Amino acid sequence: MNKPYKTATNIGARFLFIAGVASVALSLLSTAALAQPARPGAIQPAAHANQEPINHLPNPYETQRNFGTLPDGRSWGSVSAVNIDIDGIHVWAGDRCGTNSCATSKVDPMVKLDPDGNVVQSFGAGQIIWPHGIDIDSEGNIWVADARAANARELAENPSAAGKGHVVLKFSPQGELLMTLGTPGETGDPPTHFDAPNDVLIAPNGTIYVGDTHGAQYQNEAGPTAKSRISMFEPDGTFIKSFGEFGFEDGQFRSPHSLAMDSQGRLFVADRGNSRIQIFTQDGEHLDTWYQFSRISGLFIDPKTDMLYAIDSESDENYNPGWQKGLRVGNARTGEVLYYVRAHDSKRGSGMGGLGSMGEGVTVDRKGVVYAGEVGPIQGMTKFIPRLIP
């Protein structure tokens, strides 16, 4: 039998056949890759892609790590709840009792520090499980968002931790409990319940705003457990209304993680799961959406200067590709980002992935000194001292 000649036509035909098979295989692999479910919480609003990452701006701050010395030589745990005292000098912090929960601890989680880091007051032992957000009202009262209840392991170790958490607590300047919003130890919907409240803000007129819920940032689509909202209460705790829901559009949230108000009375919401700030009237009408401050965990606005401090503890290639963790400082009136402080070096990855560590809560004293509460992998407090700001 004669063998066929290896003509150019035969070779070309074989090449086309092989190329066709390879193309089909690559197409199938690509389709399979697209079919893989997105990492929980990784999907972002479409408008997010239009914002170029801002990672390279001047840093006018000197960083002081390990700020603050706790009583009895105890170590700091995770800290996200930080706010400046009514005097503009002292800073309040909610330490998660040396670890990441106070459910089995007997120490005071709420501590008041002077500018040198000395604790001058503390309270809250046995009352708070997971201090997550904090605000100080015009009378010096301390409001704490306690964002979870004790888990099964913690309850087995300390049964008295039952019936606590998922609430907003109002304390007097001396640490006396004055008011409880929500039903302790239970999750649900307002007006009687919260579901892992992130933060609380008291407006100048006394209206109470609560950002709820924490876990929504890890969900990619709506469902029975996908909740996100801002709830409003009268100064005496009477429920007014809730606004917002889970989603990616303007006026929707995926975990309203931190709240702030500017000198015009506009409500700023750090919508962390959607990597943006949303701005509202005090009645909940949506005004604007900003993506230039990254994936914000903590938000603070100086009421006199409208300087905006946005701290990002989570950005990495999984959850906010192209952006880096850090502190971004800008103007709440114009939206311009002016300064950037990069994350601390860390050989350990954060809970979200990626290396580096930056605070989750942020506040500023009357001299412009910035204080950050660190959740991990570095914990405790950090102080940023302005050196080069005109």
Question: Model-found features: residue ranges?
Answer:
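Eukaryotic scaffold repeat domains enriched in small/polar residues
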Residues: Q36-P390
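A detector of low-complexity, intrinsically disordered, Ser/Thr/Gly/Pro/Ala-rich segments
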Residues: Y5-T7, L29, I134, L178
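Long, low-complexity, intrinsically disordered N-terminal extensions of eukaryotic proteins, enriched
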Residues: N2, A32-A38
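A periodicity- and composition-biased signal for non-globular, repetitive helical segments
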Residues: T9-G12, G20, E176
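Bacterial N-terminal signal peptides
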Residues: F15-T31
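N-terminal secretory signal peptides that target proteins for export/translocation
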Residues: M1-R14
